[in-house]
Regions:
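Glycine-rich phosphate-binding loop of ATP-dependent small-molecule kinases
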Residues: 1-207
Length: 207
């Protein structure tokens, strides 16, 4: 958002965005970055950057991805730790990680090791029917604009991704609720209203 005022935190915060595919995590994470000056840690972006870096770790990532295998939690945690090493006054927002209970435990251990804590986990809640409509609509808009369409932007792929989400990632809601850090947002409304609510939650987490 050009010309936006950055609302820096009173202290660095670590925030996780949770939600099913198509909930708008990436979009809202970028808004938090613009508003609060935080750093977005997107595992997808980090893996792609590592793959293209030519480093030893990058070559490992490239080999795993070329085989079509899942990148190990060890590699993902290493990438996150490396990204966090530079530090940032306003903190970090995790987008797309953790996705499993094991990853949540690993992230908690990393934060504790570096003298930090998890301040808030914010779940974006969207009905499955709305998610399907969003994904199908996104694909139709891309086609109309002559842009490439993501291979998984269709109803069938989304249903498979949702099944995986509810099996592996949804249990994190109970996990973080038990730790007292879980909050939720109705993410079926206007983007600006969602962003405003999310921004207030992030600001409160820094108190």
């Amino acid at each position: 958002m050009d010309g936006a005022t950055v609302d820096t935190q009173t202290r660095p915060v670590n925030v996780i965005l949770l939600g099913p595919p198509g909930a708008g995590k990436g979009t809202q994470a970028l808004r938090v970055v613009d508003t609060h000056g935080m750093v977005q840690l997107s595992t997808g972006d980090m893996l792609r950057a590592a793959k293209d870096s030519g480093t030893e770790m990058g070559n490992r990532v490239a080999e795993v991805m070329a085989r079509g295998d899942l990148v190990t939690d060890e590699i993902v945690i290493w990438l996150i730790e490396e990204k966090r090493t530079g530090g940032d006054a306003a903190g970090f927002i995790f987008d797309g990680f953790p996705r499993t209970l094991a990853q949540a435990d690993a992230l908690g251990a990393l934060l504790e090791k570096t003298g930090h804590r998890l301040d808030a986990v914010i779940a974006l809640e969207v009905d499955d029917e709305i998610l399907v409509n969003r994904i199908v609509g996104r694909a139709e808009e891309a086609r109309a604009a002559g842009q490439p369409v993501r291979a998984d932007d269709n109803a069938e792929s989304l249903k498979l991704r949702l099944t995986e989400y509810y099996k592996k990632t949804a249990p994190l809601l109970g996990y973080f609720h038990a730790k007292g850090v879980l909050q939720s947002i109705d993410a079926m409304g206007e983007l600006d209203a969602i962003a405003e609510t999310l921004s207030a939650m992030v600001k409160d987490a820094a108190i």
